[in-house]
Amino acid sequence: MTFFDSCARMSARRTCAALPFLAFRGTTMKRFSILLILLFLTGCAAAPVETSEPTLPTPTTEVPVPAETTVPVTTTPPDPIQELLDSMTIEERVGQLFLARCNAESALTDIQEYHLGGFVLFGADFEGQTPDSLRQTLSGYQAAAGIPMLLAVDEEGGTVTRISRYPAFRSQCFPSPREAFAGGGLTQALSNEEEICQLLQSLGINVNLGPVCDISEDPNAFMYQRSLGQDAAATGDFVAGTVRLMNAYQIGSVLKHFPGYGNNADTHTGLAVDSRSLQALESSDLLPFSAGIEAGCGAVLVSHNIVQALDRDSPASLSPAVHQYLRDTMGFDGVVMTDDLVMEAITDRYGTGEAAVLAVQAGNDLLCSTDYAEQYSAVLSAVLDGRIDFDALNASVMRVLKWKQSLGLL
């Protein structure tokens, strides 16, 4: 037997010997496999099941955003007076500075040529008229004016009566404030002023050059008969009461003659110098003006007196210092006007045209003028060549227009 035969026999024996084991092994392996499968399935069933976090549904519509709120913009309505001023020519603006003495023969032409701010009516303008004819005349003046006019008069009563001296308008002259007060105190004096307001209103006159604020104790003084004849306190009560009455009737009030005439001479015929101290003026003469300003007066008329406490050289009407005192110290923001610029206290020293220029430069808004043709040309030239500040001109015209507005003219 060869080596290879021997090996073959040994291999056969091993195989035969292993068969029972393999048979057992095969059965066992099947069972083991089945057991593993069952264990695996059981383990899978017992294992916890992972659950994912719930997801919110994606919104399909946009979340509404609150509408943006807008704050309403408040706009200041345009000022009709400013619009009127802006529309005016330089010539028209200069003309508004003039309260001219009415010349009946050329009145309609002059209103349009010089663009006059107003007329002052004197006795001759009422002579031969009736209330109806006068109303018609004054309506004609207003119709001719591009801008409604101030129609003013001196109806103080007593020695200064432009209207009531004529029976067509009143059976007898109005008494002076002094006479009315002496007859019935403040009540009677104010009743007299109210009747004056009613008469002026009925005729179409919108300004009375009063009340007189002056205090005069000297029976020989120029202003004595025209003053109330009382102390500063009583005069102040009369002035304030008169201003309130005039405002109620829409009659323009004009406090005169700032800063107080006192016992001084008549400036119609020459220069008057007041040498009193400022303390003396402030403790007496200026008090009625303060009362009138507080009551709401429309205008203040400045005298031609040289008041040395405020300006040692210039008449008050032409003095920047006097006007500054009236504005800054007295607190007056209305119309400031001159007494008539043809009075000799002015013309003898300055001439007609130059006086008007100086009056505007001093701070007057309104010039009482008889020679308005010459003075209008002088003021216009001074504006054009820069001697009169254009902004100052506009400020004066604005004050005049605002006064007209307060009187129901604009």
Predicted feature locations:
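N-terminal hydrophobic targeting/anchoring segments and the immediately downstream early-domain regions
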Residues: 45-48, 53-151, 155-165
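Short, Lys/Arg-enriched N-terminal segments with co-localized hydrophobic residues
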Residues: 17-28
